[in-house]
């Protein structure tokens, strides 16, 4: 396999996040419904919508997406594909009683940490997490959630029982993509969800139909999930309260702890909605 400059269709998400733009000729080669095209359209707008109501069939509350910095538009685009309502969180007053789950996107964790404080969003999000409500952190979001960082003295929410190493995979030009299963269950208890299939709990709630068989989200294993790393962290130490959901070459890159999901990679930069479906089913 030859060297890649991250401008091919496979690696284009890395190019967009690293350089903040994308070559139009490559975007033109993608289907107009491709999540990357949708996300770039969000980013390109001078003023994007701060709220999306979601489809009438969606049975989910509103997902608040931290939108002070980072890849929040890509998460919003992914939720739009699933018909799930969302709201961008830019200031403390944006966090209201409609929010029943939160996404902490990738970006620059130190900058996000400072902006969380200056916008007044830190306290309501911390209270949300302390109440045991669902939260999903990707890349920088994992760093914000960690109990401790092994190469940084900052501690943010400190809710995830893990020690995380910032920028463990090095510089942005060292970013890469891989594939691995996501889920800790094994044997007969595992419910395998192949690429292109819906996560059971999400599929039932989105259709409005009740499930005839109760399936715990703990038992779900997402087969062959695409992992996109952009100067990502990994988990240096896993505490007893957290469960390893996925590893790559011996490094832990996905954790779950109750209703906390955390990934070192960026599922929002792929066309695979399964982790977002899993999050919405918590």
Give the ranges of each region predicted by the language model.
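N-terminal beta1-alpha1 cap of cysteine-dependent amidohydrolase-like domains
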Residues: 2-118, 123-128, 186, 193-213, ...
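C-terminal and late-domain segments of enzyme folds
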Residues: 39-43, 175, 189, 199-219, ...
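Solvent-exposed alpha-helices and their adjacent loops that cap or buttress functional pockets
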Residues: 56-59, 94-96, 127-128, 136, ...
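A secondary-structure boundary/capping signal
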Residues: 68, 138-140, 160, 231, ...
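Hydrophobic anchor at the start of a short beta-strand
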Residues: 86-87, 135, 260
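Redox-cofactor binding/interface segments in oxidoreductases and associated redox assembly factors
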Residues: 103-104, 137, 263
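Cysteine-nucleophile active-site neighborhood
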Residues: 108-190, 206-209
């Amino acid at each position: 396999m030859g060297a890649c400059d991250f401008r091919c269709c496979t690696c284009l998400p890395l190019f967009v996040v690293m350089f903040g733009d994308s070559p139009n000729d490559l975007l033109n080669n993608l289907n107009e419904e491709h999540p990357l095209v949708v996300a770039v359209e969000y980013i390109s707008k001078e003023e994007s919508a701060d709220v999306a109501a979601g489809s009438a069939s969606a049975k989910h509350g509103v997902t608040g997406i931290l939108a002070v910095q980072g890849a929040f538009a890509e998460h919003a685009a992914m939720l739009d594909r699933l018909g799930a309502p969302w709201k961008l969180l830019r200031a403390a007053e944006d966090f209201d009683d409609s929010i029943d789950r939160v996404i902490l996107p990738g970006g620059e964790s130190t900058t996000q940490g400072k902006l969380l404080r200056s916008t007044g969003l830190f306290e309501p999000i911390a209270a949300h997490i302390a109440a045991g409500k669902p939260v999903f952190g990707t890349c920088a979001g994992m760093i914000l959630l960690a109990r401790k960082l092994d190469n940084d003295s900052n501690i943010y929410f400190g809710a995830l029982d893990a020690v995380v190493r910032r920028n463990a995979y090095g510089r942005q030009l060292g970013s890469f993509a891989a594939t691995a299963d996501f889920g800790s269950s094994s044997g007969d208890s595992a419910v395998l969800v192949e690429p292109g299939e819906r996560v059971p709990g999400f599929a039932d709630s989105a259709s409005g139909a009740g499930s005839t068989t109760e399936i715990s989200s703990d038992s779900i294993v997402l087969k062959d999930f695409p992992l996109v790393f952009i100067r990502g962290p990994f988990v240096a130490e896993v505490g007893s309260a957290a469960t390893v959901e996925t590893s790559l070459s011996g490094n832990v890159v996905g954790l779950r702890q109750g209703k906390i999901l955390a990934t070192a990679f960026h599922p929002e930069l792929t066309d695979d909605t399964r982790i977002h479906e899993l999050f919405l089913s918590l």
